[in-house]
Amino acid sequence: MTSFSTSAPCSAPDSARRISPEQTNQVRPKLPLLKILQAAGAQGEMFTVKEVMHYLGQYIMVKQLYDQQEQHMVYCGGDLLGELLGRQSFSVKDPSPLYDMLRKNLVTLATAATDAAQTLAIAQEHSMDIPSQDHLKQSVEESSNSRKRTEEGNIPTLPTSQYKCKNSREDEDLVANLTQEETSRLDLGFEEWDVAGLPWWFLGNLRNNYTPRSNGSTDLQTNQDIGTAIVSDTTDDLWFLNESVSEQFGVGKKVEAADPEQTSEEVGKLIDKKVTEVGKNDDLEDPKSISDDTDIEVTSEDEWQCTECKKFNSPSKRYCFRCWALRKDWYSDCSKLTHSLSTSDITAIPEKQESEGVDVPDCRRTVSAPVVRPKDTYVKEESSKHFDPCNSVEFLDLAHSSESQETISSMGEQSDNLFEQRKDTENMEDCQNLLKPCSLCEKRPRNGNIIHGRTGHLVTCFHCARRLKKAGASCPICKKEIQLVIKVFVA
C-alpha cells in the first residue's frame, strides 16, 4: 500500500495529479476506462476522482466480479477491467494495482492559466522532501469529514438491489449538490486516499452482502522514513466506519493492538460451548436400561471386556449386555475346584477345636488371658511342617500336625458333601417354585417374567403380569416399577 514516502522524487504526471484542489477539480478518463465507467452508469467525459472510484465500484457490483465467499477478492480475468489492469485478479485489501491503473488512464485538465501554477507546484515538490504537518492534518481531516458525511447514507438496511440503487442515487445527488469548495475537498491525491486503504464508497456498496468473518481487527504500524502509514485488516467489513473520528486516523500516532483479554474471553466461550455440545452426546446408552444398576462401588478395573463386541460389563454379569455373548471363563462353566481350603473348612476348624477343650470364660477378655483364635492355631500347624524331625518335641508336634491334617481333610470332604447336598436341595426348591402355579391366580403356571431394570421376578403367569403392568402396579416381590413383561418358556 502506498505511504507518505519522500525518498524518491515524483514524476511529472504524478505531481500534476497531486495539484491542490483549487487548481484542478476534474479528470478525463481515457477511452478504455471511459467505457468501463459508462457501463456502470456514468454520463459525460469529465469526472472527479471520487466519481471515477464510485463508478468502478458500481461496475464490479453490476458485473459481479467479486467472490461471493471472499468478497474482498475481485476476479477480472477476461473482462475489460482485467485487460486494463493487466492481471486476472486483485484484492481490495491491496488496491495498489488499481491505483497504478488510474494514474495511467486519468488525464488532468490543464489550461493555459494553470500551466505556470503547475510548474511552480512541481518545483516546490522537488525542493521539499517532507510534507508539512499542516498539510497532513488537513488531508486527514478532509478525508474523515467526507467519510463521516457519507457514512450516514449507509445506515438503512434494505434489500441488496434497492440498497445499491439508493446508494448510487445518493452519491450522484451528493456530487451534484456540492459547492465548488466542497467538491475540491473530496478530490484528494492518491497518497491521501492510501492513508486508510480504499475509500468508504468502494466497499460501501459491497457492505450489504459482505459477511464479517472476525470479531476484531489487527492494526499494524509501519514506519517509512519520517511519514507513518496505518495498515488495517478490513476483514471485519470496514470496522472503522463505526468508530469516532479520533479513533479512525492518527498520522504518526502509535496504534494499540487488540485487547488480549477480550480475545481470550471469546476463545474461552467458544471452547466451553464445544465442550458442552460434546458432553451432551457422550451418554449413548438408554438411561432406563441402567437406572436399576445399584452396584455403585464397581470400578472400571473390575469390569470385564466382551470378546465379541469389546464392551466392558459389570463383573456380576454372565452375559454381555450388548451382544449377549457368554463371558469367557465364567466360573459356572469351569471344572469344579477343590475346596480343601474353602471357607466351609475354615469355619469347621474352630468348631472342632472349641469342642476339644478350649475353655471360653464368661467374663470379659483381658490382656493377660488372650483368647486363642483358630486361625493362629491353623497357622502354627502349617508352620510345623518345616521343622526338623530330629528334635523330639518338634517330631511330636509334626505327628500331631499330621493327625490334625487328616482330620481337616476328612472334615473338608464332609463339608463338600454337605455343600453339594445343600445346593441340590436349593435347586430342587427352585424347580418346585417354578412348578408352582401363579402366586396371584394360583391356576396358571409361572410364565410371566416381570422385568424392572436389569433384574426380573418370575412369580406370576403372563396374564396376571400383563394385568399388573397395565394397571401400573409394582412388582409383588420387590415393589419396583414394572418396565416390561415377557413370557417365559421352560424347555
Curated annotation (Swiss-Prot):
Gene3D superfamilies with a match to the protein in the record: SWIB/MDM2 domain (1.10.245.10), Zinc/RING finger domain, C3HC4 (zinc finger) (3.30.40.10), Zn-finger domain of Sec23/24 (2.30.30.380)
Q: Name the residue ranges of motif: Nuclear localization signal.
A: 443-446
Q: Where are the transmembrane segments?
A: none
Share the record's PTM remark: Phosphorylated. Phosphorylation at Ser-368 promotes interaction with YWHAG and subsequent ubiquitination and degradation. Phosphorylation at Ser-342 also induces ubiquitination and degradation but to a lower extent.
Keywords from the UniProt entry: Metal-binding, Nucleus, Phosphoprotein, Ubl conjugation, Zinc, Zinc-finger
The reply on keyword Hydrolase is no
User: Which lineage is the organism of this entry classified under, starting from the top rank?
Assistant: Eukaryota, Metazoa, Chordata, Craniata, Vertebrata
Chain positions with Phosphoserine modification: S342, S368
Locate the SWIB/MDM2 domain: which residues? 25-108
List the GO biological process terms.
negative regulation of apoptotic process; protein ubiquitination; regulation of biological quality; regulation of cell cycle
Locate the region Disordered.
1-25, 131-163
- List locations, semicolon-separated: Nucleus
Q: Which SUPFAM superfamilies match?
A: Ran binding protein zinc finger-like, SWIB/MDM2 domain
Quaternary structure (record): Interacts with MDM2, TP53, TP73 and USP2. Found in a trimeric complex with USP2, MDM2 and MDM4. Interacts (phosphorylated) with YWHAG; negatively regulates MDM4 activity toward TP53.
Region annotation (Necessary for interaction with USP2) maps to 394-491
What's the protein called, per UniProt? Protein Mdm4
Recorded name of the encoding gene: MDM4
Query: Which superkingdom?
Result: Eukaryota
The principal location of this protein is nucleus
- What GO molecular function annotation could you give as one example from this UniProt entry? ubiquitin-protein transferase activity
